[in-house]
Design a protein with these regions (language model features):
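Interdomain "pre-motor" coupling segment immediately N-terminal to P-loop NTPase/helicase cores
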Residues: 3-75
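Pre-Walker A (pre-P-loop) alpha-helix and adjacent loop at the N terminus of AAA/AAA+ ATPase modules
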Residues: 51-127
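Basic, amphipathic alpha-helical bundle interface domains used for macromolecular binding and assembly
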Residues: 101-108, 286-424
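Short glycine-rich substrate-engagement loop in P-loop NTPases that contacts/grips substrate
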Residues: 158-192
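Canonical AAA+ ATPase core
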Residues: 173-176, 201-209, 217-310, 390-392
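Terminal-proximal interaction/regulatory segments of ATP-powered molecular machines
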Residues: 401, 408, 412-541
């Protein structure tokens, strides 16, 4: 088989919804002419096309088995049917070798592919020669572009890269003869219209050009000489040799925040050196052997993005994400007013977040999630987590997001967005010191701890604040004055009960503010009811 071969068998029969083939013969005497000489099958019958989720899986398996040697299955899933767990501890630190019971995946291959599907923004980090650029180029070829066009469209960061070099140059004749900026035409760079955009070594781009790039990433347009070019939806791939923001130029914080997901290239396993030599001797370049079966047209690209957005997120999964996010943001000593007691308040005023966290007493700093981080989750980060969790569920052939999908993608989305508090005693132990350099395992552990706390609190079955909000969101039309008073009394009772715990955990603070929100809505509605009833009573015949 050649490098461009894609097996026709389903990558995951259960996800594909196919039944195993069974040998079935005709009953004696039942053959007729149509059985011996079957007519051509009509167009549009089953088997003439591949479902987009199956096509996405085939693209992944071709990449991981044929294109890039990356035998690192660091995104693990389990069958969940009581299959025996196989884990071996290696070395003096007890490094765990776990053998998953369900299909598991290489993050360096899968996360860029999911970025392609959702048209997100992916940062590939790692040392030189690790395959970052090759992986990004493969994404461009998967979009149907010739290799030469992908390479021409790839932007290379360097200290002299200007805004016009990167985006477009005004025509010289217009610069000479134009009477206003509106008369100047700009020769836009062709890469701006591509569905896959690649910025190699983005941390070597000058700060001024980074600011222009930020506008393109954030708003989807670029401006040169008062002329606008809308770039449209695209999958972005940026590469860097480290994720500390360093390089020739420090990366602008706002630009780093626009990146949806960060993936590290893992080291090459010398066990696979024979395959590497074979590729070198055969001059094999994976980007030139991409099978047509895994290339996505523009229409398919639009369709797969729309299908991913239609994947449902069950309330139980969403509540766990909300609980996790709540734990990270609260900072009890950041302000006096409840709404301002967040790490963001302290950061904006130049405060020492780690010092403020040390002042919190009465907490177990080893289990308190807020103590381990210097920042919380932004709205953009929450949206990215949900989008990639949907993409993971879609890739695995599911119509609903499972908690394991969320757990798989969350560390890669938050890797560059949640900063650890190294003053926390969690990082003082031998195991904690390993987590300092392993942000993916640290963030996954945070999520696991949050889920345990969520289950211990029984919030799936006992969520009175959620009931209040659900009742409010049904609308106020027809709700009587007496019913409003009853609901306000319940809200006030719930608010008082929140103070019985004595400790201001993140979900408690968020529940308190949610109750205040509902109280304001009902109070305003009751004022309107009183005004309306008074107006009606004072009206003459």
């Amino acid at each position: 088989m050649g490098y461009g071969y894609v097996p026709s068998s389903p990558t995951d029969p259960r996800a594909s919804g196919l039944e195993p083939a069974r040998p079935v013969g005709p009953a004696p005497g039942s053959l007729d002419v149509a059985d011996v000489f079957p007519s051509a099958a009509p167009l549009g019958t089953a088997g003439t096309s591949t479902a987009l989720d199956e096509k996405l899986r085939r693209a992944y398996y071709w990449m991981v088995n044929e294109a890039i040697i990356s035998p690192h299955y660091d995104i693990e899933f389990e069958m969940g049917d009581g299959a025996p767990d196989t884990t071996v501890n290696l070395g003096e630190t007890g490094a765990a070798l776990h053998l998953p019971t369900a299909p598991s995946y290489s993050s360096f291959m899968l996360m860029p592919l999911l970025t392609f599907a959702v048209r997100g923004r992916c940062l590939l980090i790692g040392g030189p020669g690790r395959g970052k650029t090759t992986s990004a180029i493969l994404m461009g070829v998967l979009a149907g572009y010739p290799v030469e066009q992908v390479r021409r469209g790839m932007q290379h960061g360097h200290p002299q890269l200007s805004v016009t070099d990167m985006f477009g140059t005004p025509l010289p004749r217009d610069l000479v003869g134009a009477e206003s900026l509106a008369d100047i035409d700009v020769a836009w760079r062709s890469w701006l219209g591509m569905r896959v955009k690649i910025i190699d070594e983005y941390n070597r781009i000058p700060t001024r050009t980074q600011s222009a790039l930020l506008t393109v990433l954030a708003d989807g347009y670029v401006e040169v000489y008062d002329q606008l070019y809308e770039t449209g939806d695209a999958a972005w791939y940026l590469t860097a040799n480290d994720d500390a923001g360093g390089g020739t130029y420090q990366v602008v914080e706002a630009l780093r925040d626009r990146i949806d997901i960060t993936v590290a290239a893992l080291p090459f396993n010398p066990r696979f050196l024979p395959g590497l030599i074979q590729r070198r001797e055969g001059d094999f370049r994976p980007e030139r052997h991409v099978p047509a079966e895994v290339v996505f047209s523009a229409a398919e690209h639009d369709a797969i993005s729309a299908q991913i957005q239609s994947v449902r997120v069950p309330q139980a999964v969403l509540r766990r994400l909300a609980f996790f996010a709540s734990q990270l943001e609260v900072c009890e000593h950041a302000a006096t007013q409840l709404e301002y007691r967040s790490k963001d308040t302290a950061r904006l005023t130049g405060g020492d977040v780690a010092g403020l966290l040390r002042r919190s007493t009465g907490r177990d700093r080893l289990t308190d999630l807020a103590d381990q981080t210097l920042s919380g989750m932004s709205v953009r980060a929450m949206n990215a987590v949900i989008t990639y969790a949907k993409a993971m569920a879609f890739f695995r052939g599911h119509s609903d997001v499972a908690l394991e999908d969320l757990r798989a993608v969350l560390p890669f989305v938050l890797r560059d967005k949640i900063q650890p508090n190294l003053d926390s005693p969690v990082f003082a132990s031998d195991e904690g010191r390993l987590l300092v350099h392993d942000p993916v395992s640290w963030l996954r552990g945070l999520m696991d701890t949050a889920c345990l706390a969520y289950d211990a609190a029984g919030l799936d079955t006992d969520d009175p604040v959620g009931e209040v909000l659900a009742e409010l969101h049904q609308g106020l039309t027809g709700v009587t004055h007496a019913e409003v008073r009853h609901r306000l009394a319940r809200i006030e009772s719930l608010a008082r009960s929140l103070g019985y715990g004595g400790k201001l955990y993140g979900h408690v603070a968020d529940d308190a503010m949610a109750l205040k929100y509902a109280h304001q809505r009902y109070s305003a509605y009751m004022s309107w009811l009183e005004w309306d009833s008074g107006s009606s009573a004072g009206a003459g015949p």
